[in-house]
Amino acid sequence: MLRSMWNFLKRHKKKCIFLGTVLGGVYILGKYGQKKIREIQEREAAEYIAQARRQYHFESNQRTCNMTVLSMLPTLREALMQQLNSESLTALLKSRPSNKLEIWEDLKIISFTRSIVAVYSTCMLVVLLRVQLNIIGGYIYLDNATVGKNGTTVLAPPDVQQQYLSSIQHLLGDGLTELVTVIKQAVQRILGSVSLKHSLSLLDLEQKLKEIRILVEQHQSSWNDKDVSRSSLCQYMMPDEETPLAAQAYGLSHRDITTIKLLNETRDMLESPDFSTVLNTCLNRGFSRLLDNMAEFFRPTEQDLQHGNSINSLSSVSLPLAKIIPIVNGQIHSVCSETPSHFVQDLLMMEQVKDFAANVYEAFSTPQQLEK
């Protein structure tokens, strides 16, 4: 039996060697294929876990954004009410002064300015914080993902985070003061000559707000016979590059350098077309909500209905400007409310804001960011 098998192998030596080689190759390829499949499965599982972890961190970061916006609204409201103190004028009117008409004119400008600035600054706060917290959130995610790895440097240590996020104070301080000045000039130009007895409908108010926005956002007109150069709304949210940290040519710590890098990345975002589009969408929604809030005061009376005026017409009811002023003056408490109001909720829940936040977070939470 063994001899016959040996003779068979001798007669078919080449064929047996070939067959053995083929079978051995198939076995090795099978093992190699199994190893590669296992590696692919492990890599896909790791990527899935990393993506799920990043998604969870992103969603948590958005909740932090929302809570931060709400927590800062009282500070914004207080700063506005301090700079545009209409309450003191209202108190003066109750004392029946001799310059009553002059006080009413001041109240007209301050009331409209305050509500318009409230809309602008709240929209800016919502979008700016989305940018800042998603940039820093991306860095924090990368820090957490690389913790424990040899040779890794923390991208955003707590002291850098604090220094970077403190830049929001520009919007609540000098930036807000500049914004108040610009908007007050625009309001004076559009409404300064409008008589207190002149009646305006909701449609008229909408048109006046549009005219004021054009002056504020495009700066294509001149005030007080002086040319006003074009500028973006970015200047109210971030100081110029030459100020505080960036102006120091020497003595910068590693923390300062990292903070400047974060601020420059933020400025790049603020100057991008996407940011401009999102902020403009927020402003459109904000002013629309402002008009909605005032619409309830323009409801037709029974007498109007008897005369056949349409309930849905924006021009069916008109009020003297003197009666509109208190309505406008009180809008700051709705716009800058720390309790989730329709105004703030509308801004926080806008799909454009969510998508923009996701894009910012995606850009700063990828491993490629480590190579920069």
From Swiss-Prot:
One of its GO terms (cellular component) is protein-lipid complex. Residues 1-15, 141-372 are cytoplasmic. The chain crosses the membrane at residues 16-36, 117-140. It comes from Mus musculus (Mouse). Residues 120-136 are annotated as: Interaction with PEX19. Belongs to the peroxin-3 family. GO terms for molecular function: lipid binding. Residues 37-116 are peroxisomal. The keyword Transmembrane applies. Signal peptide: none annotated. GO terms for biological process: protein import into peroxisome membrane. Interacts with PEX19. Keywords: Membrane, Peroxisome, Peroxisome biogenesis, Transmembrane, Transmembrane helix. Involved in peroxisome biosynthesis and integrity. Assembles membrane vesicles before the matrix proteins are translocated. As a docking factor for PEX19, is necessary for the import of peroxisomal membrane proteins in the peroxisomes. PANTHER family: PEROXISOMAL BIOGENESIS FACTOR 3. It comes from the Eukaryota. It is found in: Peroxisome membrane. Residues 1-45 are annotated as: Targeting to peroxisomes. It is a multi-pass membrane protein. Identified in all tissues analyzed, with the strongest expression in liver and in testis. This is Peroxisomal biogenesis factor 3.
